[in-house]
Structures are given as structure tokens and as C-alpha cells.
Amino acid sequence: MTETETRSDGAAARTSLIGEEDEWIVREWIEREVGPVLSLEREGRWRPAWFVEVQGNDGPKRLFVRGARGGRWPARPLSYEAKVHRIFEEQGIKVPHLYGFIEEVPALVMDRVPGRPNISTAASEADRKKLLEQLADQMRLIHEIDPALIVEAGATMPVEPKAITFSAYRDAEGLYLDGDRRPSPDIEFVRKWLDRNVPPAIYDPCVIAMDAGQFIFKGDELTAMLDFELVCVGDRHADFSALRSRERVEGFDDPEGFYKLYEQRGGTPVDIDHVRFQHIAFSLYTPLQIANDLAHPRDQEDYHEYLIWHAISMKDALEGIAESMGVALAAYEMPAPARTQYLASVEALEVMAASLTLSDDFAAYRRDKIVLALQYLQKVELYRDAFAAEYISEVAELTGTRAASEEEASRQLEAFIAMAGPEHDEALLRVLHRQVKRQAMLLADEGTWLHQSLSTPLRPLNKD
């Protein structure tokens, strides 16, 4: 069964259970439009998606059905992504063949293309080099698509140079401003800094993927570009900034080298200062979109994952501002943990959740997420008093008023940011970065890739 709510763009957003009714709709659509369904399996993750095997005229074929996120984001509905996907396919971009769009679910039905993500897993440096060349070619082809086609699908066409720079960012900001949220001094500080420092675009607007660099490959062949829900018309430097975010875990360890490769393969020259600015805006994109969901959790949304996204993204945004300002941010030293009388209750719940009997991959996914959330709450219990005391004291030093709680401190800090001039930027940056690091350290165990991602400073971009 489903529910709907009104989104800021007037589209109906799915926000609740994806159940058997939806699977039957998917099955019936595929059997009507493609062929008899041999198997249909729900993917083990929060976003509704299915792996489907179909009997075709030339034998079995594999399909992938991708549902909507739910909630209030992204800014445009899944039907928009279907139109963009079709345009990309018609324009020669290497995408999975799209069979159609199931409006009732909603969902995209496409070929399941062989391949895997993460270029760091390429078998050799020679394979990696060929894959990067193909990615540069695909990005250039996307940037060369007539923007009018994407505007016709539902995007806006920015005209004024600063509007071009902010095109994609304003989409996410609109969701944030229209929604109900918790006090967010970190987001408010970055928003204000971006508005004060936005550079005018140096190129005409073009088609951009925004969440760029998502692809799968097999051997030395890029088999498909993926995920077009954020495609819009704007500044191409936004796409290059997205690759910087992929440096941490997806093998893009030389973004500057890729920018030169893009130019060598026919793309326009890349301006590093514009990439730096766009990376700050790109990093804020996700926190802007999920602020409402963090304040109001919904079923079928991965709350723990959203906390991780917020922490990583805000860390990158603040460290990007520090890079632009020439400010060196200090490492955060964790306080000593303090075990409370309530911790055993959370530990008991974790043991209980870990022992749950499972029926399928999706049930296993939900069980594992419950366990992760309970582990997070255990860390909250160990550090919350020390973290709160540190944060309240730091905010009081800035504002001159001592809050009674963390939430009150955040409200005071947000009000201070609204009135503060640029002379306070460095002090605010340090306080907010320390708070984001506290949030981040609650989400990851030492020795994990996540802990490394959250504790490793953003690598500066070099112009040479």
C-alpha cells in the first residue's frame, strides 16, 4: 500500500511501504511490455529495486527495476529521470537500455548491464587508464547535449552567470528551505558562505549529471553510466567537483590528472578555483536534501545511512571552506568514554537484533541496519555528556550565552551565524568542524573504511 504527500514541485512523492502490491505491478508491467517473468527478487537495500529475469525471444534476459527514493527529495520526480535517461540513450550516452517507466510504483525498467563500480578495483593500471579515458569521453558527450532537451524534460535554464554556478545547488536549497528541520548551524554557515563567495560561471550553461562519475565496468570497458536523478543545466565544474568526493573510496586519487585528461580528449579547460567552490556546494547538496528526513524519520528510509551522509558531506564542505580561506583545522581528540547505567539496555537490544531469523536479503539488510543503529546509540551513550559539555562551552565562548542543552546551543549558534559578518568565519568554522567530527566519530569504528573516510582530511586540489 502507498501514501502520497505534496512535494515542493507539486509532484506526488512516495513515502511509505513498498510491498507485495508493488511487486505485482512490476511483474505485470514487465510481462506485458517485455516478456514472461522467470524470477523477481527485491534488492537488499533501503531504496526499492528488483532484479528480474525475463524470457525473451532470444533467451533469458536480465532486467533491473529501480524505484523512487521516497520522502521529499530529489527535487524532481522519478518520471523526470526516466525522460533524461531516454534522452541520454538517444544521444549516444552509454546507458542501460530503458524499457519504460512504471508510473504506479513508480519505477524505471532497464537492462541489467554487466559490470561493477569502483575503479580502484580495476585489474591493472592499463585497464584503469582506459576506463578513465572512456569516462572523460562520456562526461564530455553529456556536456555537449543540447540543454533545451533537458529543459523540455523539466529542468530550468539558468541565464545570469551566478545563477549558472548555483543552478543545481538551488534545487536542493529549495527543498531545505521549504521543509521542517532541526537547528542546523552547520548548514546555515555554509549556505551563507557560499552566497557571499559565489563566482560567476565562466562558461555557458550545459547539461550536467551533478552526481557525476557513477559508472560500472567490466575489464577495461566502461559498460554503463548510471543514476541521472540530479541531471540539470548548469556549470560543468559541478561535475568535476563530484569526482573529488569520489576520491576517498572509489579510486579517483588524481582528480587534477582527470581534469587534464578531459581537456586532452576535447573537453573545455577546467578551472580549479571553480571546482573548489563547486565542491563546497556539492558537499552541501545532500545535507540540504535530507535535513527534513533527519528531523522526521520515515519507514523505508535508511536513517543511519543518512546520518553518515550528513557527517561526511558536512566535513567535506567545512574543510573545503578552510581550504579556500587558507585555514588549518586542528585534529579532534576524542574524550574518554563514560559508561552509564543505560548502556547495557542498548547492548541487549543489539544482541537480540543480531539473532533475528531472516527470510530474504532485504530482511537481512534491515536487520543489519538495526544492529548498526544500536551500535551507534551505544557510542552516543558513552560520549554524549562529554560531547555536549564541549559543544555548549564552545558555543558560549562565541555567543556570550551558555545554553542548557545541545539543541539550545545549536539554536543560539544558528542565530549568531545569521547576524555574523565574515570576520567571524574562522572562529565559526573551527567550532562547527569540531562538532561535525564529534558526530562523525559516533558513526564509525576504528579500522573501518568509514572511520578512515571521516577522519582523513580533505586533500587540497593543486593547480599545477
Label the predicted regions.
Residues 39-163, 174-186:
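ATP-binding pocket architecture of kinase catalytic cores
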Residues 2-4, 13-14, 175-176, 288-345:
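ATP/Mg2+ or Mg2+-diphosphate-binding catalytic cores
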Residues 237-270, 280-302, 309-324:
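Active-site activation/catalytic loop segments of kinase-like enzymes and analogous catalytic loops
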Residues 249, 274, 278, 336-340, ...:
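Short, solvent-exposed segments of well-ordered alpha helices
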Residues 214-240:
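Catalytic activation segment of kinase domains across protein kinase-like and atypical kinase folds
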Residues 17-33, 37, 145-213, 219:
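An alpha-helical support segment within catalytic cores of ATP-dependent transferases
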Residues 343-368, 372, 377-464:
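C-terminal amphipathic alpha-helical interaction region
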Residues 1-106, 198-206, 216-223, 325-336, ...:
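Conserved NTP-binding catalytic cores of kinases and kinase-like/nucleotidyltransferase enzymes
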